[in-house]
Curated annotation (Swiss-Prot):
This is L-lactate dehydrogenase 1. Homotetramer. SUPFAM superfamilies: LDH C-terminal domain-like, NAD(P)-binding Rossmann-fold domains. It is found in: Cytoplasm. One of its GO terms (molecular function) is L-lactate dehydrogenase activity. It catalyses: (S)-lactate + NAD(+) = pyruvate + NADH + H(+). Pathway: Fermentation; pyruvate fermentation to lactate; (S)-lactate from pyruvate: step 1/1. The active site is at 178 (proton acceptor). The lineage of its organism: Bacteria, Bacillati, Bacillota, Bacilli, Lactobacillales. One of its GO terms (cellular component) is cytoplasm.
């Protein structure tokens, strides 16, 4: 009888997001081996013991405090390390310091002989995903960012609450930057085939400006959480586990991720949030959604801002790249 494939994950960054992601992996029985890397070694040691204490009630898993060299035979390296977003800061404000942190991570991971898939969650995620691709020299299909996964989930939640349906039954996407320039695709977003925009028109009691209100609520949700409790981690930690499961289980699932543009939406040389198909080999297909003129303009504006910030940050930090 052939042995079952052992899935191994190396998590880099054991802060609020990283530890929540690790707990989600344990709770859902995702992967059989998890190594945790962080600049604070004792924290990873403590988390490894604490997380292992949860396994008797779920599924066996080898969990340990790891080094970068342990990535050599990993299937997935997940990067959540970076300076956290503070009250009043945008995700783009983090770019220079987190580019430098990222450079110190990617280089030793690549030097370890790692030949798997990078999944990036640190912010600004679109820029750091593109930077990981450039720093690593990896093929584009093996560097993926969490993109607008969390934003899309928030949108589905808000629409579900409004229409009194399960958020999992809401077909909706947020596209663009995981940040202030993201936008909902109202020309597509629907529940059971009925566009949300048409539903709002049929229910005037929700208000004629409801679509704009939903957009603002979703885009500002992170700021609201950060102002109240200091950081966001449950939503993104769970979203990361969901992406991980889709990759390791070869689900060929469509998810809103930060992926490379090669002419989609008229964009090039940038990673940005759009639906994409992922499986065990990483990125399988980038899906270009049909957008109306207003949405296309928003996508271009989002990409333009990302590109300007990214190019300036690469120049100012002088981080080493391979491509």
């Amino acid at each position: 009888m052939s042995e079952e494939k052992i899935h191994k994950i190396i998590l880099v960054g054991d802060g609020a997001v990283g530890s929540t992601y690790a707990f989600s992996l344990v709770q859902q029985g995702i992967a059989q081996e998890l190594g945790i890397v962080d600049i604070v070694k004792e924290r990873t040691q403590g988390d490894a013991i604490d997380l292992a204490d949860a396994t008797p009630w779920i599924a066996p898993k080898t969990i340990y405090s790891a080094e970068y060299s342990d990535a050599k035979d990993a299937d997935l390296v997940v990067i959540s390390a970076g300076a956290p977003q503070k009250p009043g800061e945008t995700r783009l404000d983090l770019v220079n310091k987190n580019l430098k942190i990222l450079s110190s991570i990617v280089e030793p991971i690549v030097e370890s002989g790692f030949n798997g898939i990078f999944l990036v969650a640190a912010n600004p995620v679109d820029i750091l995903t593109h930077a990981t691709w450039r720093m690593s020299g990896f093929p584009k299909d093996r560097v993926i960012g969490s993109g607008t996964s969390l934003d899309t989930g928030r949108l589905q939640k808000v629409i579900g609450e409004m229409e009194h349906v399960d958020p999992r039954s809401v077909n909706a996407y947020m596209l663009g930057e995981h940040g202030d320039t993201e936008f909902p695709v109202w020309s597509y977003n629907n529940v059971g085939g009925v566009k949300v925009s048409d539903w709002v028109k049929a229910h005037p009691e929700v208000g004629e400006n409801k679509l704009e209100a939903i957009h603002k609520e979703v885009a500002d949700m992170a700021y609201d959480i950060i102002n109240k409790k200091g950081a966001t981690f449950y939503g993104i930690g769970t979203a990361l586990a969901f992406i991980t499961k889709a990759i390791l289980n070869n689900e060929h699932r469509v998810l809103p991720l930060s992926v490379p543009m090669d002419g989609e939406y008229g964009l090039h040389d940038i990673h940005i949030g759009t639906p994409a198909v992922v499986g065990r080999h990483g990125l399988e297909q980038v899906i270009e959604m049909p957008l109306n003129a207003d949405e296309q303009a928003k996508m271009e504006a989002s990409a333009k801002q990302l590109k300007e910030v990214m190019d300036k940050a690469f120049k100012e930090t002088g981080v080493k790249v391979r491509q």
